[in-house]
Amino acid sequence: MREITPRKIIEMKGKEKIAMITAYDYPSALLADKAGFDIVFVGDSLGMVVYGEPNTLNVSMEQMVFHTRAVARAVKRALVLADMPFGSYEVSVEEGIKNAIKLIQAGADAVKIEGGYDHKKLVKRLVRMGIPVMGHTGLTPQRYLRLGGYRIMGSTEEEVEEIIRDAKALEKAGAFAVVLEFVLADVAKLVTEEVSIPTIGIGSGPYVDGQVLVWHDVLGLYEESPPFVKRYANLRDEILGAISEFKKDVKEGKFPGREHYWEFQDKEEFKRIKESVLRKVD
């Protein structure tokens, strides 16, 4: 069992901020764990930042299992959280249970489900089975078509009511935490005060119990990123510069240099081998 468990995350509420970051492969997960993140999250955002999809709706269970397995191999300390992709739990509770089990068997410590009140039965069943669940309300990318696109949530009484209802339903069903995405900070603060489980924000202000960002956004791997992101590096330019230099060296015959390859020390022996081999294959 890894050091950080759902129980540990619950105990951090109001005491220590929870740090969570996405990772989609072995090397990124290795670094995230070494950096000391509490939660390493295999998000369905991989559809967009890894596979170039316009949204998360086309991410499959097979993709999530594949990437979860890679991340789980790398992480020794942090809690490994895996997303339930669109279509993997909406049809029935039984279907959701089957797919959650696949992610746990791939090495996840917990699963995340978008939505709250509508999926309380599934959350309750999973928790009873021993599968920890994190909920997700506010802007739910898997439902962006219904929401009218990606926009900040919580500006109307109806939206605030829905967000609060979702969070409380998740709490009652046994979820150990809830993500609040792109929610007005006042509303995120209200939710944080109203539930006993930790709230983890993304674009929802400072009044939550923790924060999560996407790996590629933190590192500046794309030209554009969501407006709530703080870039901690601009690796796109650094990577582009490095690979451009490699291409230039290849074109100009500068790579490989003498230190990058090996030759026969005994040239006469190589001459003998060459003549022998060429006679045999002629």
Swiss-Prot record:
Primary gene name: panB
The family this protein is said to belong to: Belongs to the PanB family.
Role summary: Catalyzes the reversible reaction in which hydroxymethyl group from 5,10-methylenetetrahydrofolate is transferred onto alpha-ketoisovalerate to form ketopantoate.
Subcellular location: Cytoplasm
Domain of life the protein comes from: Archaea
Pathway assigned to this chain's UniProt record: Cofactor biosynthesis; coenzyme A biosynthesis
Organism of derivation: Pyrococcus abyssi (strain GE5 / Orsay)
Reactions performed catalytically: 3-methyl-2-oxobutanoate + (6R)-5,10-methylene-5,6,7,8-tetrahydrofolate + H2O = 2-dehydropantoate + (6S)-5,6,7,8-tetrahydrofolate
Keyword Ribosomal protein found: no
The protein's assembly and partners: Homodecamer; pentamer of dimers.
Keyword Aminoacyl-tRNA synthetase: no
UniProt-listed GO biological process terms: coenzyme A biosynthetic process; pantothenate biosynthetic process
Keywords: Coenzyme A biosynthesis, Cytoplasm, Magnesium, Metal-binding, Transferase
Cofactor detail note: Binds 1 Mg(2+) ion per subunit.
UniProt-annotated binding residues for 3-methyl-2-oxobutanoate: 44-45, 83, 112
GO molecular function: 3-methyl-2-oxobutanoate hydroxymethyltransferase activity; magnesium ion binding
EC number of the protein: 2.1.2.11
One Gene Ontology term, aspect cellular component: cytoplasm
Protein name per its UniProtKB record: 3-methyl-2-oxobutanoate hydroxymethyltransferase
